[in-house]
From Swiss-Prot:
Originating gene: LEGA
Entries under PANTHER family matching the protein: 12S SEED STORAGE PROTEIN CRB, OS03G0336100 PROTEIN-RELATED
UniProt region (Disordered), positions on chain: 187-248, 298-325
Job of this protein: This is a seed storage protein.
Annotated signal peptide: 1-21
Quaternary context: Hexamer; each subunit is composed of an acidic and a basic chain derived from a single precursor and linked by a disulfide bond.
Family listed: Belongs to the 11S seed storage protein (globulins) family.
Record domain Cupin type-1: where: 39-273, 337-486
Gene Ontology MF annotations: nutrient reservoir activity
Source organism of this protein record: Gossypium hirsutum (Upland cotton)
Cross-referenced Pfam families: Cupin_1
Biased composition, class Acidic residues, residue ranges: 212-228
Protein name: Legumin A
SMART domains: Cupin_1
Domain of life: Eukaryota
Length: 509
């Protein structure tokens, strides 16, 4: 039977319209979910204890993080603690809040350029030489850029705790899974962390709290039934042993068949059995029995070299020459920069504070990650001029002190007007106007942006939108005199700050 072309066209058109309508509805539903009418400063919701540290997660299901497409965690590493190798499904920025240590990042396809010199000397006597990819030192104030799917580990070789704040950009185009944060562990027993993240994932998928509890109870019942079933216990000894070991081991290597792994690594089955055996609930941060001995550059030598390189970079940038990133190969690209040094500040006011920015121009890898950051300091009662982020969401973490923050949406409603305390997190959506003023003890913060070249538009000051408007437009828009319009435009000579003396004079007037 011949098919009528008109009928076929109408059928295809109907199907296309149906698909388009479904996509449009889904898009509208997603947009409606992100009609933010209220923001909150929040602390971590979950806390997972490991042998030598803790991992804390903010709830990625909360509206402000979900709509920004990010997840945030905080890690505390005790002295001599080792964060076991893992990778994530999304690029991340890691800020060192306190402490110092070493970190290794495994770039796929890159050579092992670090070699043990002592073993090199004894190689002629038959001793094997160890070699591995580059190990970097980190210290307080460093920001480290980690691409998605790249293995990383870290070790606290200092005498104080290391604290990091990690932003995972789950909404990034590089993440082709979903917006649930996923850490793929290659060692250790991340069972508790996985359980907590599964619970948060269930919330993100719209399951009720009662449904989560019933599913957990069912899961526990199945485990008990499996243990009590005699037919299961009668299995062959090796399978039974492997099953018992894997039940307390949740990293990627545990689930693979032992024979396959033995062939893949070209080692004996006993070695694979040791790899897959996890004794005790040590978690994902373990305590090393003896000091970890790996090849690293001397601490002061590397830090001094980094400072010299940064100084040369800034000198060239200020002279009009900007790094284009082409001279950096994938294997040798810089992934770290320190923002804590006051001399590193890009914006500075001796009465108000300073801001240091990090973007794709001074750390080219950020162009790949589509992220950027800033570290800010406000002195006693000083403030940041009202402004908005043109092209990015802003995720602010208070490092020290506190600040009053106001955020205003497109309806002119204040969706946040409160203090952000030390250790709290606040998301400022794209285009929402905001301002902040430090408390009596000042304030320090780190902000992450979901764009590699985040741009702000100040509402007052020397580079503001108000300064760029004609005087007549200001007078007509706000129904003020020409003299008042002139004062609004030109009275604040600062670029991004206002000082406490200015605000006090306005209040007294």
């Amino acid at each position: 039977m011949a098919i009528n072309p008109s009928l076929l066209f109408l059928s295809l058109l109907f199907l296309f319209n149906g698909c388009l309508a479904r996509q449009t509805f889904s898009s509208q539903q997603s947009q409606n979910e992100c009609q933010i009418n209220r923001l909150r400063a929040s602390a971590p919701q979950t806390r997972i204890r490991s042998e030598a540290g803790t991992t804390e997660w903010w709830n990625p299901n909360c509206q402000q993080l979900r709509c920004a497409g990010v997840s945030v965690m905080r890690q505390t590493i005790e002295p001599n603690g080792l964060v076991l190798p893992s990778f994530t499904n999304a690029p991340q920025l890691l800020y060192i809040v306190q402490g110092r240590g070493i970190q290794g990042i495994v770039m796929p396809g890159c050579a092992e350029t670090f070699q043990d010199s002592q073993q090199w000397q004894h190689q002629s006597r038959g001793r094997f030489q160890d070699q591995h990819q580059k190990v970097r030192r980190f210290r307080q104030g460093d920001i480290i850029a980690l691409p998605q799917g790249v293995v990383h580990w870290s070790y606290n070789d200092g005498n104080e705790r290391v604290v990091t704040i990690n932003l995972l950009d789950t909404g990034n185009s590089a993440n082709q899974l979903d917006n649930i944060p996923r850490r793929f562990h290659l060692a250790g027993n991340p069972e508790e962390e996985q359980r907590q993240l599964r619970r948060l994932a269930q919330q993100m998928q719209g399951r009720s709290e009662r449904g989560e509890e019933s599913e957990e109870e069912e899961g526990e019942g199945e485990e008990e039934e499996e243990e009590d079933n005699p037919s299961r216990r009668s299995r062959h000894q090796e399978e039974e042993e492997q099953g018992r070991e894997s039940s307390s081991c949740n990293n990627l290597l545990c689930a693979f068949d032992r024979n396959f792994l033995a062939q893949a690594f070209n080692v004996d089955h006993d070695i694979i059995r040791k790899i897959q055996r996890v004794r005790g609930n040590r978690g994902t941060i373990i305590r090393v029995r003896d000091r970890l001995q790996v090849v690293t550059p001397p601490r002061m030598e590397e830090e001094e070299r980094e400072e010299r390189q940064q100084e040369q970079r800034y000198r060239h940038t200020r002279g009009g020459s900007q790094d284009n990133g082409l001279e950096e190969t994938f294997c040798s690209m810089r992934i770290k920069e320190n923002l804590a040094d006051p001399e590193r500040a890009d914006i500075f006011n001796p009465q108000a504070g300073r801001i240091s920015t990090l973007n794709r121009f001074n750390l080219p890898i950020l162009q790949r990650l589509e992220l950027s950051a800033e570290r800010g300091v406000l002195y006693n009662r000083a403030g940041l001029i009202p402004q908005w982020n043109v092209n990015a969401h802003k995720i602010l973490y208070m490092l020290r002190g506190c600040a009053r923050v106001q955020v205003v949406n497109h309806n002119g409603d204040a969706v946040f007007d409160d203090n952000v305390e030390q250790g709290q997190l606040l998301t400022v959506p794209q285009n929402f106007a905001f301002m902040k003023q430090a408390g009596n003890e000042g304030a320090e913060w780190i902000s992450f942006f979901t764009n590699s070249e985040a741009t702000n538009t100040p509402m007052a000051g020397s580079v503001s939108f108000m300064r760029a408007l004609p005087e007549e437009v200001v007078a007509a828009s706000y129904q003020v005199s020409r003299e008042d319009a002139r004062r609004i435009k030109f009275n604040n000579k600062n670029t991004f700050f206002f000082t406490p003396s200015q605000s006090e004079r306005r209040a007294d007037a």
